Every structure is written in structure tokens, then in C-alpha cells.
Regions:
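A SIS-like phosphosugar-recognition module
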Residues: 224, 235-239, 244-347, 352-990
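Conserved short alpha-helical segments that host acidic/polar catalytic motifs at enzyme active sites
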Residues: 1-380, 519, 537-543, 549
Length: 990
């Protein structure tokens, strides 16, 4: 317990706040736990501050390590930290609680009448700076040997500050390998310097954010006020501000705050509309804490952005979802929850009919109108899309659809990003898109759905999260499980099975609707579905065998492959994803029969999925496995229970029997379990190296000189790893470069010539060198399992398909109606047309010309006229030379907005190409909006040339600056087409 003795009601609330933050750390450390820190900033009135005079002087620490205390202008800041390269989830929280419990000074200060606290904590996956108490966050603004330039400040960081080195020089901070080397250090230093200039805290952090490069989330505090400052920049990080009855709770993931409140405000790092810089900054004061009205918010430019009530969201995850129970990792827990997820997906969707059990989907899942469009033939094609694991689930759903509806519909499965890139048509009213997403917020999938729906496609979605973005875009929704089946692990498992279950239900329903499925066939498929949960449960009895095989082979083989045939191609594809995600392997996947034609000589570890194979195919598959084994490969076979003796390998796992067409689902589950245990085996290789690094850092903290030889206790674990490598056990995970680096550390004391200069690493001292070598080795073989390394180190985004809407404007429609072949319009031309369409009020007509001869001396002839152009005589009605503005468009190969010299008509001239040769010109007669938004005018000018730059240059010849907002005050036609000098005079005159 944190509370000593009998606390006052006021201090009891304080201890509750501290424990709330510690519980959030406990939940968040699944994403990183090599160190953690917590500050308790106690705000005191003047009388209580006087009582502290000199009492905490002995706790000053320039490195702000655990147990340090800093007396500030408004109270005192206590700091507690724990760093452990070797450890498990929960260790950091335990260490911090013990330090807090045993701190008599803290308890005495919290008992003072005026004491009020803010608590800031952080759990770290180190990317910059060694793992140590000094580098654990929060860090402070003080620089050893320098006078304090401004108010005392502290900060914690998620993400990386890419220009940390340059900023450290700017603030005259020299990182010390014995001290603080994390990039987070520049945050409080810069913030303090900004505050010294009398800046408002929020404005000061906005200014700092503009100096930082990278993707980051920041929490900071200063003695200039009692508010906590937050900042987010870039697309790789976010923060969530929980609105609780007792105050604000902030976390980098929603599950960090749900124990206190389910209501939250998300803080993202993208640029606000109209802002020139990315980022958002918030100030959370103690007064009004927990209320939306108390929050102040700025964009990256420092402009206030009020918080609206409509921005508040409700979390779906609960504390129950966060409990690990007896599992070591969330991934393992979630694989074991798969039978329940599958069963919940079937529940309520199977009904007893006259002919037995039947699928019965409600109109909310399969709307009546969509059902009619499919049954009467208006829908002729179904496309199943998803991204990542959901894209593989889409392949499985498409298989069930083929089995259920036969050739009545064209069936395709593909990644959503590919669908939006190459498969969209102007008219998609004959298409039904089935979109699969665990979260309902996948960028690629949702963008594809938007584009298909705009073109008339029917949209059905299979999604886990209720009220998510995808559900609002869909005509019908099939929720997986109970619509809120949370996955904490980054690698998705149980959602995959549930998505397949929902897709199979939909396939059976459509098969009956189209009168393709016989009652017997439907009953067989439904029976197979109902047996899957039991099979998944029975599979867990084979986990010990899967774990043993993984322990024997996972670290031995550098090359891996997963193969399958028929339905098992889907299993192979999904197992490949999990093996790649968890084990950081580049893995191939092929049909079993193709493997011998591709890389048979790789001597690889090959996972062979053959469960449910037709009896007539089994003997052929056995021969394929024999060929693999004969060429030095190591096959692991996932087959039907009872056939284990048929396969020419000792590594065989029999799977619980079920419907042959659904055995691939069970094979996938077996592959997931194998992937989990393979990752654990690989990660175990890193454990002795973590021990070595922890011992080294401990020795440094206790005075080991950087130039000293490495202690024997550091080298012993390294020797153990090298001996394992010498036996061939680590050939698949330890590169030769890393192994040589480790060997040189061991040989260095006996071979003086193998000092730091013998390495390619930039290290000048033996201890520095050992840090680099050990850290690289740990990074090479460490496997976090519930997290994915690249998601912690880099920015991950989805495709936005910004150019997928280039056909979605009235100008393109008018050209199409006039006979223009839209496929002959280049993407740069379409982008210009899209930009110009934003300033065009309406299209009045089109003149379509054919271009003949060489472009330099070609001719044009009218092919077709529409609208207002139909009554206009043209010199090219019977052919004429290509000249004037049309010739200029032909030379530039880009669209141009022009005004006729004689008639004053405004037209958009668009070139059409055939095999890179100009074939046609389309002159679109248009009427512009009287006034346009400045951003639309700028976009139109920038799309087709440098007119905007010319305007700015001309205006600033006579006035010091130019504000683009002025463009909106003038007629759009003048802005876009009037002579630049004339326009500049009007703008300069104001």
C-alpha cells in the first residue's frame, strides 16, 4: 500500500491519484518496459513552502534519478524511477510503489494543509540513450555546470526528436554517457528557455514543437503554473485525455485511462485546416480539472482551437479486456480466446427452420434492398477487401462465397489498397463490396469503401467495433463476436477467426437467396461451422508439441517458408503474416507443389499446411514433403489427426478433425500458436545479452571507468551465447557480424589489438563499445511479441488514395459525355482538372478536337460539340492548323484555364494522349464562381504553373508582405486570368 499510517481525507485523494497513474503505467508498459519514471509535483502555498526550507537539500540530484527531490518556486517535485533491462511486466510498477511507500519526506509534504499534486509518469522503450535511471522519463531542464536559464521544467516523450543533436548544441547541452543521453532532455531545456522570455506556457510549448523534427507525443510541466502541458506532432503518436470526475487522466493509449473514465478527447498530431505547421498543444489546469471547458488548445501555429463537446468519445475497452489472467502475453491469451470469439459470432445468427438449422441474418446485416439487388441480378460482382490480416480473411470469405454461390456472381478478394488503386469504375452499381476490418478505422479499407460507395456500390462490412467509422459508411454490418472483442496484442488472431465465421454466414445466406445451395449442402456447411469452436479448443491440447517444435527449430534456420494447397493457401498466407510480425522474418508462401520449382536448395524451415486435403491429393502431397526433406529442408506438417504416420518427417502435428473445407481455419490457429512460441524461443536468445548489458550499466553506475576492461560478470553471459551459436543453434537469428562483435568483446582483454579501433562502430572506449555491441545484439534477437518493433520506432500510415477522386467532378463528367477517353488523360492532367473544378461553378459546353500530324505543325478538326458550344462556329469545323493557346497546351501536355481574346469566353483546354502522342484536345466552356475561397484559388493556380508565385513577387515589389486571404476579396476570374501586373496593383492598393 502507498498510504502510511492514517492519511487525511485530502492526502488520501492524493495517494489515489498516484495509484491511478501507476495503474495506467502497468497497463501501458506492454508497449515498452525497459524503464519507467514518475514525478509527484506538490504545489504548496507560501506558508507551507517556508516549512520546507533546507529540509530537502540532501535529495538534490543533477541527473534526476530515483529518490531525487527539487524544491521549486511553487512547491517541490519528487521523482521516482526504475530501469531494468532484464525483467517482466509489473516489475517497474512494483519498484515505483516501494520507493513511494518508503519516502517519509513525501508523506510529510503531502500531509501539509495546502498540498495539491499533479502526477506525471512514463514507461519507456528506449530508442535514444542508454537504459538507466537518468534516462528514464521525466527529465528536467537543469544542465550541469550551467546557470538555470528559466523556470524549472520537466517532460516525458513518446517517439523520437530527429534533430535532437542540433537542438542540444543550440541550447549548449552536451550529453554525458554517464548521465542523460535521451533525446527527451532538450524538451524541458528549450521549454524553460522559452518561458524565461515571459511566454505563456502553452505558447512556449507551441514554439518548441515547431523546433522539433519527427513524430512525437510530449507531456510537460513547469513551475510557472500548475497546469500540465501536452503536445503531439506527426502521424505516429497520439494522446488521450480522459475526463474523469476527479480530474484529467492522460495516456498514450485509451486502455491507460479506462479504469478511471470511459470519456476521452483524442489529441492527434496532424496539421489543422489552415495551419502551416503540424501539431496540437493542450494545457490542462488543476482548476476545473476533468472538465472540457478547462482545456486550452492550440494548433501548430499557436492559434487557439476551442474544444467542442462533439469531440468527446466513449471508450469501448474495459478493464476486463486488459486483464492478462494467467497468460504471460496478450497474444497467447487472445489465441486461447478464439473459440469463444468464433462461438459468439455464430450466436443469434443460426435459427431452427423446417429443414433444420439455417442462417438468418437480420436486415441490419443484409439489408432488404441489397438482398434484392443480388437476387435479381443487378449486382453481378462481389469484391471482398481488407488490409493485412483482414485481407487474408477476405480470401477465406471469398472461398466460402465460391462454394455457396457457384458461378452466379463474379467473386474477387484483394487488399483494399489495390482495389482503390486499380479496380474503381465510374459506375459500380453492379458491385457489392464486403469490407473486413477489426477496428473499423483502417485507412485503406475505409477510403476504398468511400470511393466504391460514391460510385453506387452496395457496401457490407464485417467489423468488430460498434459505431466505428466503417459501420457508418456501410449499408449492412455483420459484427464479429459481440461487437467489442478487444485485442491488446498488435498481432491480430482471434479477430481473424471471427471475421471468417461472419463471412461464411453471409456466404451461406447468399447461396440460399440465389437458390444455389441445396438443403443438404447448407446443413453440411453449418455443421462444420458449429464444430470449429470445439476444434479450436481441442487444438490447445497440442500446444505443448507445437511449443517443443518451435523451441527446437525457431533459432536454427535463417530461411523460412509456409506452403499450402487449395483452401490451405489462405492458412499459409495468414501464418506467414504472424510469423513475420512476431519473429521479424521475411517469409515466402507458395503452393505446396510449387515449392520444388522455386527455392528448394535454400535448406529452409518449411511449414506445410495440408489439413483437410482431399484423400486423392494426400499421396501427392506426401511426395512433395519427401522432396523438401531430401534437399535439406526441414518440413513441419500440419495435417488431419490420425494421418501423422503418413508424412516423411518427425515434425508432425495432427489437428482435430472437422469439415474438410474448414480445416484450414484450425491449421491457421496451429500456425498462430507455433508463431507465438517461435517468437518466445528467439527472444530467449536475447536474455543472456540483456543480463550482460544490465550488469555493465550497473558497474558504470557504481564507478566503472569507460576505459576499463569489461568485468568478467559481463562477459560470462556473452560467452554462453557464443557457445550456443558455435553449436549451430542460433544460425537463424544471429548474424555473423553480430557474432563477431560479441566474440571481440570476449577476446579484447586477451588481445589488446582488438580494441575499439578494430570495430566499425563509432565508439572510443571499451565500455562504450560494449554498450553498442550488446544493444545491437539485443535489438537483433529481441522479440517483444505483444508489440511490433517498427511500430514503436517509425511512423506507420495507411494509403490515403488522394488521387482516387480525380474523376469525381463535373468537368470530367462533361468530357466523358462528349466522347473523351478518360483513360487517355494522364494523372498530372487530371490533377490540374480537379484543382480547376473547385473554382468552376458549372460547365456550359464542350468542343472535342482530333489532333493530326506532328505537334509542331499539326492540325485540329472538330469531332463533337455539346451544350453551348454546339451553336458556335469554329475555324476547325473542317480542319485548321493547330495554333495559339491550343498549340501551347499541346506543347506543355497539361491543362490550362484560358480566356478568349475576342469573345472573352472562359475555357479549360485539356490534352488527351494516346501512347504519349497528343491525339485530341478538349475545350471545356465554363462559368467560374464569382468569389472563391483563397485556398481553392491558390490550388488552381499552383496546379498549372507559377502564377501564384508571380502574384506574390509583383505585390511585394511595393508592399512588404502579401496575405493570400486577400485573393478571396476579388472576382475569381480576375485572380485567375487577369494580367499579373494589373492584379498586383489592385492587391497592393488594399
Amino acid at each position: 500500500a502507498l498510504i502510511p499510517g492514517q492519511p487525511t481525507p485530502r492526502s488520501a485523494l492524493t495517494y489515489l491519484a498516484v495509484e491511478t497513474v501507476l495503474q495506467a503505467v502497468d497497463r501501458l508498459e506492454v508497449r515498452g518496459r525497459d524503464s519507467a519514471g514518475l514525478s509527484v509535483w506538490v504545489h504548496l502555498d507560501e506558508a507551507d513552502r517556508a516549512l520546507l526550507a533546507g529540509s530537502l537539500a540532501g535529495r538534490a540530484d543533477p541527473l534526476l534519478r530515483s529518490g531525487s527531490a527539487v524544491v521549486t518556486g511553487d512547491g517541490v517535485c519528487f521523482v521516482y524511477k526504475h530501469a531494468a533491462i532484464v525483467g517482466k511486466l509489473g516489475d517497474n510498477g512494483t519498484a515505483l510503489r516501494l520507493a513511494l511507500r518508503d519516502d517519509a519526506d513525501l508523506h510529510a509534504v503531502l500531509a501539509l494543509p495546502s498540498a495539491a499534486v499533479t502526477v506525471l509518469a512514463h514507461t519507456r522503450w528506449a530508442s535514444v540513450g542508454r537504459i538507466s535511471e537518468a534516462n528514464a522519463h521525466p527529465v528536467d531542464s537543469r544542465i550541469a555546470g550551467a546557470d538555470d536559464a528559466g523556470p524549472f521544467s520537466i517532460a516525458a516523450l513518446n517517439g523520437d526528436i530527429d534533430n535532437y543533436g542540433a537542438l542540444a548544441k543550440q541550447v549548449s547541452y552536451e550529453p554525458d554517457e554517464r548521465g542523460i543521453t535521451t533525446d527527451a532532455k532538450v524538451i524541458p531545456v528549450l521549454l524553460s528557455q522559452r518561458l524565461a522570455q515571459d511566454a505563456d506556457p502553452g505558447s512556449a510549448l507551441c514554439a518548441c514543437l515547431g523546433d522539433f523534427a519527427g513524430s512525437m507525443a510530449i507531456a510537460a510541466q513547469s513551475e510557472t503554473g500548475d497546469e500540465v502541458l501536452l503536445a503531439v506532432k506527426g502521424s505516429g503518436q497520439s494522446l488521450y485525455v480522459g475526463l474523469g470526475h476527479g480530474g484529467f487522466v492522460v495516456a498514450s493509449e485509451v486502455y491507460g485511462l479506462v479504469a478511471t473514465t470511459s470519456r476521452y478527447l483524442r489529441v492527434g498530431g496532424a496539421a489543422w485546416p489552415g495551419a502551416t505547421r503540424q501539431g496540437t498543444v493542450l494545457a490542462l489546469p488543476r482548476r476545473g480539472s476533468g472538465t472540457l471547458a478547462a482545456i486550452r488548445r492550440w494548433d501548430g501555429d499557436g492559434v487557439l482551437r476551442p474544444v467542442e463537446p462533439a469531440e468527446v468519445r466513449t471508450a469501448e475497452v474495459t478493464t476486463r479486456d486488459l486483464a492478462l489472467d494467467s497468460a504471460v502475453h496478450y497474444l497467447h491469451k487472445e489465441i486461447h480466446e478464439a473459440p469463444s470469439s468464433f462461438r459468439k459470432t455464430l450466436r443469434g445468427r443460426l435459427r431452427q427452420g423446417a429443414a433444420g438449422v439455417q442462417v438468418g441474418l437480420p436486415p441490419s446485416s443484409l439489408p432488404t434492398e441489397v438482398r434484392r439487388r443480388i437476387s435479381d441480378g443487378r449486382v453481378r460482382e462481389i469484391v471482398v477487401v481488407g488490409q493485412g490480416t483482414a485481407a487474408v480473411a477476405a480470401q477465406g470469405v471469398a472461398q466460402f462465397l465460391r462454394a455457396a454461390v457457384g458461378d452466379r456472381l463474379v467473386l474477387t478478394a484483394m487488399p483494399a489498397s489495390e482495389f482503390s488503386a486499380s479496380c474503381l469504375r465510374p459506375d459500380m452499381t453492379d458491385v457489392c463490396v464486403i469490407a473486413i476490418s477489426q477496428s473499423g478505422t483502417t485507412t485503406d479499407t475505409n477510403r476504398s469503401v468511400d470511393l466504391a460507395k460514391d460510385r453506387g456500390a452496395a457496401i457490407l462490412s464485417i467489423v468488430n467495433r460498434r459505431d466505428s467509422d466503417l459501420t457508418t459508411k456501410s449499408h449492412g454490418v455483420l459484427y464479429t463476436s459481440d461487437g467489442r472483442d478487444v485485442e491488446m496484442s498488435v498481432a491480430s488472431t482471434k479477430a481473424f477467426y471471427a471475421q471468417v465465421a461472419a463471412g461464411c454466414l453471409l456466404a451461406i445466406e447468399l447461396g440460399r437467396e440465389l437458390d444455389v445451395l441445396t438443403p443438404e449442402r447448407e446443413a453440411s456447411l453449418i455443421d462444420g461451422l458449429q464444430r470449429i469452436p470445439g476444434q479450436l479448443l481441442a487444438l490447445q491440447e497440442s500446444e505443448e508439441l507445437l511449443a517443443k517444435i518451435a523451441a527446437d527449430v525457431a533459432a536454427r534456420y535463417p530461411y523460412w517458408a509456409v506452403v499450402g494447397s487449395g483452401h490451405n493457401r489462405v492458412a499459409a498466407a495468414e501464418i506467414r503474416i504472424k510469423l513475420s510480425e512476431l519473429c521479424y522474418k521475411t517469409i515466402s508462401t507458395d503452393a505446396v507443389e510449387d515449392k520444388k520449382h522455386i527455392d528448394l536448395s535454400a535448406e529452409a524451415l518449411v511449414l506445410v499446411c495440408v489439413a483437410g486435403a482431399p484423400p486423392g491429393q494426400v499421396s501427392d502431397l506426401v511426395k512433395e514433403v519427401e522432396i523438401l526433406a531430401a534437399h535439406g529442408n526441414t518440413p513441419i506438417v500440419l495435417c488431419d489427426e490420425g494421418t501423422e504416420q503418413s508424412w516423411p518427417t518427425d515434425l508432425v502435428v495432427g489437428l482435430p478433425l472437422g469439415h474438410p473445407e474448414m480445416m484450414w481455419i484450425v491449421a491457421t490457429a496451429a500456425g498462430h500458436l507455433f508463431a507465438y512460441h517461435a517468437a518466445r524461443r528467439i527472444d530467449a536468445v536475447a536474455e543472456p545479452l540483456r543480463v550482460a548489458l544490465a550488469r555493465l550499466e550497473g558497474a558504470v553506475d557504481h564507478g566503472l571507468e569507460l576505459s576499463a576492461a569489461l568485468p568478467r560478470e559481463v562477459l560470462v553471459p556473452v560467452i554462453d551465447v557464443l557457445e550456443d551459436a558455435d553449436r549451430g543453434h542460433l544460425r537463424g537469428v544471429l548474424t555473423s557480424e553480430t557474432a563477431l562483435g560479441l566474440a571481440r568483446l570476449v577476446l579484447q582483454p586477451a588481445r589488446p589489438g582488438l580494441g575499439p579501433e578494430a570495430f566499425s562502430f563509432q565508439a572510443t572506449q571499451p565500455v562504450d563499445l560494449a554498450r553498442v555491441v550488446l544493444a545491437r545484439a539485443i535489438d537483433e534477437v529481441g522479440r517483444p511479441i505483444d508489440s511490433v518493433k517498427h511500430q514503436a520506432k517509425t511512423v506507420t500510415v495507411g494509403t490515403s488514395r488522394d488521387d482516387a477522386d480525380v474523376y469525381d467532378n463535373d468537368v470530367v463528367v462533361a468530357m466523358r459525355d462528349a466522347g473523351v477517353d478518360l483513360h487517355r488523360l494522364t494523372l498530372p492532367v487530371l490533377r490540374v482538372v480537379r484543382a480547376q473544378a473547385r473554382v468552376i461553378k458549372r460547365v456550359t459546353g464542350v468542343t472535342y478536337y482530333r489532333v493530326g500530324g506532328a505537334e509542331e505543325a499539326g492540325t485540329i478538326r472538330v469531332v463533337r460539340k455539346t451544350g453551348s458550344a454546339a451553336g458556335l462556329a469554329s475555324r476547325a469545323d473542317h480542319g485548321a492548323p493547330l495554333m495559339g493557346s491550343k498549340r501551347r497546351v499541346a506543347e506543355l501536355h497539361t491543362a490550362r484555364l484560358l480566356r478568349g481574346r475576342s469573345d472573352g469566353r472562359v475555357v479549360l483546354v485539356v490534352p488527351e494522349q494516346d501512347c504519349n502522342r497528343l491525339s485530341h484536345l478538349c475545350v471545356v466552356h465554363v462559368e467560374l464562381h464569382e468569389r472563391c475561397a483563397p485556398r481553392d484559388l491558390v490550388a488552381a493556380m499552383d496546379s498549372a504553373g507559377d502564377r501564384m508565385a508571380e502574384i506574390v513577387a509583383a505585390v511585394t515589389e511595393t508592399v512588404p508582405s502579401f496575405e493570400p486571404a486577400r485573393l478571396g476579396e476579388l472576382p475569381a476570374e480576375d485572380v485567375l486570368l487577369a494580367p499579373v501586373e494589373w492584379l498586383a496593383e489592385r492587391l497592393a492598393a488594399g
